Amino acid sequence: MATRGTVTDFPGFDGRADAEVLRKAMKGLGTDEDSILNLLTSRSNAQRQEIAQEFKTLFGRDLVDDLKSELTGKFEKLIVAMMKPSRLYDAYELKHALKGAGTDEKVLTEIIASRTPEELSAIKQVYEEEYGSNLEDDVVGDTSGYYQRMLVVLLQANRDPDTAIDDAQVELDAQALFQAGELKWGTDEEKFITIFGTRSVSHLRRVFDKYMTISGFQIEETIDRETSGNLEQLLLAVVKSIRSIPAYLAETLYYAMKGAGTDDHTLIRVVVSRSEIDLFNIRKEFRKNFATSLYSMIKGDTSGDYKKALLLLCGGEDD
């Protein structure tokens, strides 16, 4: 199935008219949140950037600054995230995951494990342009051990291209993983890192099937038993992304909302970053794998303008 987003270019787009609508929504007493959210969720990211340009030209004001001063809370965070240029968004999230006192490994793991080599190469370039530092160096400075090594291997973006599959190599890799984990006292983490980080996606899918045949275990079960902490989370994220990126991100969204409290940072990040890439596919996987739809879960887990805007980005119910 081809990947598709839920947000596309608005037909008959008029950036100047949109800028005027937004100014009117924020001028004077009170703010017309409905106008803001209805307009921005129905425009693509490129169109939002154009609106911001027109806004500056017409009013001499910064649209994002105005939105920040008029909106509050989670709704403000969501709208500000939607206004970030798409090509900057992942780099921005990684920078913030690495900045300050603690490192947000969850964000590093999710983004670096689920982006394609092409996407990772683009992220590295944008990161350097925007922040004047090297993403790989920053990751190395903020992480350690095998977790760090796996991140660095993924950031090389040197995964083999998908070409004809060599059955003998599939067998060798599956055996090597079995010997590096289940058959060994201790674990040879290097072996997992090399195979998971450099083989092609279609090759690895076959390796996981072969591994099941040889060992009687799903590769995820072995990772669970043989590794722990950040490395375990990263290896699992890589395996899930190899199997299906939309399914991995659907699961990420599910656990961001399941149980008490909501991880709004993750909810916003995944919905915004994937809205023009594969959010439609994520929705389908969500419905297939969980007893509810993404739309219903957002509806039950959020409130107010924040909920309205997220549901519009989600783009519909899946019965």
From Swiss-Prot:
Biological source species: Mus musculus
UniProt function note: This protein is an anticoagulant protein that acts as an indirect inhibitor of the thromboplastin-specific complex, which is involved in the blood coagulation cascade.
SMART domains linked to this entry: ANX
Source organism, top-level taxon: Eukaryota
GO biological process: blood coagulation; negative regulation of coagulation
Post-translational modification as stated in the protein's UniProt record: S-nitrosylation is induced by interferon-gamma and oxidatively-modified low-densitity lipoprotein (LDL(ox)) possibly implicating the iNOS-S100A8/9 transnitrosylase complex.
Entry text on domains: A pair of annexin repeats may form one binding site for calcium and phospholipid.
Family: Belongs to the annexin family.
Protein name: Annexin A5
Assigned keywords, A-Z: Acetylation, Annexin, Blood coagulation, Calcium, Calcium/phospholipid-binding, Hemostasis, Isopeptide bond, Phosphoprotein, Repeat, S-nitrosylation, Ubl conjugation
Residues found modified as N-acetylalanine: 2
Annexin repeats: 13-84, 85-156, 168-240, 244-315
Residues recorded with modification Phosphoserine: 35
